[in-house]
Regions:
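Active-site substrate-binding loop(s) of clan PA
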Residues: 111, 158, 196-205, 216-263
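Catalytic-histidine neighborhood of serine endopeptidases
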Residues: 143-206
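Solvent-exposed coil/turn segments that connect beta secondary-structure elements
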Residues: 125-127, 144-147, 151-155, 170-175, ...
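Active-site region of chymotrypsin-like
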Residues: 115-132, 217-231, 256-348
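C-terminal cap/linker of serine protease catalytic domains
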Residues: 164, 171, 175, 180-192, ...
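Sec-dependent N-terminal signal peptides
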Residues: 1-36
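N-terminal activation segment of mature serine protease catalytic domains
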Residues: 39-144, 151-152, 209-212, 356-380
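Extracytoplasmic
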Residues: 114-119, 132-137, 143-145, 149, ...
């Protein structure tokens, strides 16, 4: 069975500095009915605000592709438009792997500190009348040269500079403007499969191909760029079920647009991997977690780290209704990202990470016009 659920978003009118918190919803790709975790993870949560309780919908109703409607926060009433989700290859059953051994709390604490330092908030502003929404999401520095891993549905906005879309990289608590950035890789497969997502109020997807790389290109103020950025390395091997992890993001579902701009703080969660899934074959492609404060709009592009200080996953999907401790959060694995990048480019991702960012930015800039055309064709 293929299960498609919506990208998370907080959308407001551009006149009010609109923000749509872009974040893909929970998608477990499997042949059997989707199993949605209802119990909270065994976690210690450090939320940045009180999470309100809202009614949890029946998430197990569908036995076929699901089209759940995302109710974004808008100045105008939300619509019920949906977008065709990417069609992955036939999905297989959950992958069976051994349960990982316990690790020390000290190691988890150290990894949490590293992950939090590497966490960024990404905000892109779309002009009024542009036909698409402003967004707020998360990202993680994975290289000290200033390379950020995030989602493709966030990074696509960096293709729209010639349409007066501006993006800024923020960090800190609360998050403040720090850097400008430019894209250095967005999977064409995601753009082709999600060409209409840009203009949809309630798009949905699976999380497949939903990763991208952007690189810091300038400072947001007059301060010089640092010689090195705090970062966490991209893991090579996938984790196992039961592995303790740390999840970090700039969740913003319960904040008004003005609060996102002025009072957005990180959410850090200690938990464990509940299940693992594959998109196509017996590879560990998707990590599933129980509910937590990280399961909310704005967490898209956030990071999942293990106790060894490695980034093992990037948040892509989640359910978004009900108390956060009853939701389901998923991430694509670092090993999936590595494999998919190699499949699309014929090269290891480490080659891209190893070259100067100025070269990566220049090389990718040559492709921006053709990639932009894919996602803006419906506007012309």
């Amino acid at each position: 069975m293929k299960r498609f659920v919506p990208y998370l978003g907080i959308v407001a009118a551009a006149y009010f500095f609109t923000l749509a918190v872009a974040f893909v919803n929970e998608s477990s790709v499997q042949q059997t009915p989707t199993k949605v975790p209802t119990a909270s993870s065994t976690v210690s949560i450090v939320p940045s605000y009180t999470v309100p309780s809202i009614t949890l919908p029946n998430l197990k109703e569908a036995e076929s592709p699901v089209k759940e409607t995302l109710p974004p926060k808008k100045v105008t009433a939300p619509t019920k438009n949906t977008v065709s989700a990417p069609v992955p290859a036939a999905a297989s059953v959950p992958v069976s792997t051994p349960v990982s051994v316990p690790v020390s709390n000290a190691a988890l604490d150290a990894s949490a500190s590293t992950l939090r330092s590497a966490l960024v908030n990404i905000i892109c502003y779309a002009p009024l009348g542009s036909g698409f929404h402003s967004i707020s999401g998360s990202g993680i520095f994975i290289d000290p040269k200033g390379i950020i891993l995030t989602n493709a549905h966030i990074a696509q906005y960096f293709l729209l500079a010639d349409r007066n879309v501006t993006c800024t990289i923020r960090s800190g608590s609360p998050a403040i403007d720090k850097y400008g950035a430019k894209p250095i890789y967005i999977p064409p497969a995601w753009l082709y499969a999600n060409a209409k997502v840009l203009t949809q109020s309630t798009p949905n997807g699976t999380g497949q191909y939903d990763f991208a790389l952007i690189a810091v290109s300038k400072s947001a103020d007059r301060n010089p760029l640092p010689d090195s950025f705090p970062s966490i390395p991209l893991a090579i091997s996938p984790p196992t079920s039961g592995t303790p992890v740390i999840i970090a993001s700039y969740g913003a579902q319960f904040l008004a647009s003005s609060q996102v701009l002025s009072f957005l703080t990180p959410t850090i969660v200690f938990g464990s991997i509940k299940e693992i899934f594959t998109f196509v074959k017996n590879t560990v492609d998707v990590l599933a977690f129980g509910g937590s404060a990280a399961a909310q709009e704005g967490s898209s592009g956030g990071g999942v780290a293990n106790a060894f200080g490695e980034l093992v996953g990037t948040i892509t999907t989640s359910t978004i209704e009900g108390p956060t401790d009853t939701r389901s959060l998923t991430a694509i694995t670092a090993s999936y990202i590595r494999a998919e990048y190699a499949t699309e480019t014929g090269e290891a991702i480490d080659l891209l990470l190893g070259q100067p960012t100025s070269i990566s930015i220049s090389n990718f800039a040559q492709r921006i016009p053709e990639l932009e055309a894919i996602i803006t064709a419906q506007l012309n």
